[in-house]
Amino acid sequence: MSRSIKKGFFVDYHLLEKIEKANKAGAKKPIQTWSRRSTITPDFVGHTFSVHNGKAFIAVYVTENMVGHKLGEFALTRIFKAHGGMTRKEI
């Protein structure tokens, strides 16, 4: 079930402050955040975010296609290695 339209989207307040400050200064320095739950708004377009994935910060450059998605969708937390099978050594 998706979020009600009348409630609007969710963005952490501290992240909005960082965006407003960067927009006023015209800075394109990466913005470090742990807020994976924040929704990407049109104000975020053109900025680079360093989104924490639980271990490290992943650089995410925001484009127009990402608006409406969450920041955490673009910083994966799990790495798929491979299922078991024959390896080069076994051949």
From Swiss-Prot:
GO terms for cellular component: cytoplasm; small ribosomal subunit. Pfam families: Ribosomal_S19. InterPro entries: Ribosomal_uS19 (IPR002222), Ribosomal_uS19_bac-type (IPR005732), Ribosomal_uS19_CS (IPR020934), Ribosomal_uS19_SF (IPR023575). One of its GO terms (molecular function) is structural constituent of ribosome. GO terms for biological process: ribosomal small subunit assembly; translation. It comes from the Bacteria. Belongs to the universal ribosomal protein uS19 family. Protein S19 forms a complex with S13 that binds strongly to the 16S ribosomal RNA. This is Small ribosomal subunit protein uS19. The lineage of its organism: Bacteria, Pseudomonadati, Verrucomicrobiota, Opitutia, Opitutales. The gene is rpsS.
